[in-house]
Design a protein with these regions (language model features):
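Short beta-strand/loop motif that positions the catalytic acidic residue
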Residues: 307, 313-315
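Conserved hydrolase catalytic core segment
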Residues: 139-179
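Alpha/beta-hydrolase-fold enzymes
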Residues: 169-271
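Cap/lid segment of the alpha/beta-hydrolase catalytic domain
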Residues: 77-132, 181, 185-200
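Catalytic-loop region of hydrolases
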Residues: 1-52
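Short alpha-helix in the alpha/beta-hydrolase fold that links the catalytic acid
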Residues: 296-300, 323-333
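Catalytic active-site module of serine/aspartate enzymes centered on a nucleophile-bearing elbow/loop
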Residues: 331, 335-370
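N-terminal cap/lid subdomain of alpha/beta-hydrolase-fold enzymes
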Residues: 40-106
Length: 370
């Protein structure tokens, strides 16, 4: 996902690592011998530890919530300190401190690489709950997140109903065929880069081209057609390239020079490579693909009936990765299962990325609920 508008960054009051001190068995059958979760805390739990808000990050986020959602921590922001305590936890599979493909496998002494096991959303929230136990946080005032973070928020309410008071899930539902197909293509872009080397690449020589292409395609899914048309239309690249020039005399007759939208996508891909790991991208997109709250239950309704929290689902009007009608349908299914559920729609031309691109509009939408 893209970054939100700039705001002064708020530093965590505490940042550290957690390990359960034992092997962690995964839903799909794998085992992590000694997993670690990186977490960050903003503010302090009160004496009753009932003022804690857990914010689950999206695909490329980290435990440092204020770094990627800064406007929500600014003066008057939804997550501004005071009587609140906000905790962010880097999910398993990521590359920002928690155990992921780039971590050392204690059984081999080498990075997990392609041997990193499949991690489910249920695995993610189960280990997060163990961290909360360690911190003596037994009930969460609110769990909120967007995209894969919203999946975590809903799964936390299903798996640990007694410890979640409220949920806000933004732009999240089980992926349908189009989303699964797009994630597959992004993974193939990485895997077909010769530098990927079957997942055994050196951190100094990662599959840059493949990851950059995957990110560029992902950015297309995070934005809306109307935003792209408004921003780029058919303008030539702002760097001075001429897409109407033949270029055949320079061996560019087939590739040509770029339109502005192409330059933007290339830039987004190149920038992303500097801050994210390709194998982590593979791992997290698979985690996203496989989220199915009904797994292990007789039906989705049976899973949803476990939820005790009040739930707010937020769809985004121009989101075509998680279309608003899918979010509304999920809300109806939750209500049918007896869940106290509200549904809101964030009207924006920014597509799936609106939760980051329009934090003020999001705050106005959520403020009455909070």
């Amino acid at each position: 996902m893209s970054s939100s508008p700039s705001a002064a960054l708020v530093a965590p009051s505490f940042e550290g690592d957690f390990s359960p001190g034992e092997a962690f068995s995964l839903e799909a059958g794998g085992v992590l011998p000694s997993p670690t979760l990186r977490y960050a805390i903003y503010g302090e739990p009160n004496a009753a530890a009932d003022n804690v808000i857990f914010v689950a990050h999206a695909l490329s986020g980290s435990a440092r919530v204020a770094d990627w959602w800064p406007r929500l921590f600014s003066d008057g922001g939804l997550l501004q300190a005071g009587d609140k305590c906000v905790i962010g936890i880097n999910m398993l599979g990521s590359c920002y401190g928690s155990t992921g493909p780039g971590s050392i496998d204690p059984l081999t002494g080498r990075p997990y690489g392609p041997n990193f096991p499949l991690v489910s959303i249920r695995d993610v929230v189960t280990l997060q709950a163990r961290l909360l136990d360690k911190l003596k946080i037994h009930r969460l005032k609110l769990v909120m997140g967007a995209s894969i973070g919203g999946m975590q928020a809903l799964e936390m309410a299903i798996q640990f109903p007694e410890r979640v008071e409220r949920v806000i899930s933004i732009g999240a539902a089980p992926l349908r065929a189009m989303g699964l197909g797009l994630n597959h293509l992004q993974r193939r872009m990485i895997e077909l880069d010769p530098a990927w080397k079957g997942g055994h690449y050196s951190p100094d020589e990662p599959p840059r081209e493949g990851l950059a292409l995957a990110r560029a395609l992902a950015v297309c899914t995070y934005k809306s057609p109307e935003l792209f048309e408004h921003r780029f239309a058919r303008k030539p690249d702002r760097g001075g390239e001429d897409p109407w020039a033949s270029g055949h005399e320079r061996g560019q007759g087939l590739s040509g020079q770029r339109f502005d939208v192409a330059g933007y996508l290339d830039y987004q891909g190149e920038r992303f490579v500097e801050r994210f790991d390709a194998n982590a991208y593979l791992a997290i997109t698979r985690t996203m693909d496989t989220w199915d709250p009904a797994r292990g239950y007789p039906s989705a309704e049976a899973a949803f009936r476990r939820i005790q929290a009040e739930v707010m689902l937020v769809g985004i009007s121009s989101d075509w990765l998680f279309p608003p009608d899918e979010i509304a349908e999920l809300g109806l299914r939750l209500e049918k299962a007896g869940v106290r559920c509200e549904h809101r729609e964030l009207v924006s031309s920014h597509g799936h990325d609106a939760f980051l691109a329009e934090p003020d509009e999001l705050a106005r939408l959520l403020h009455p609920y909070l």
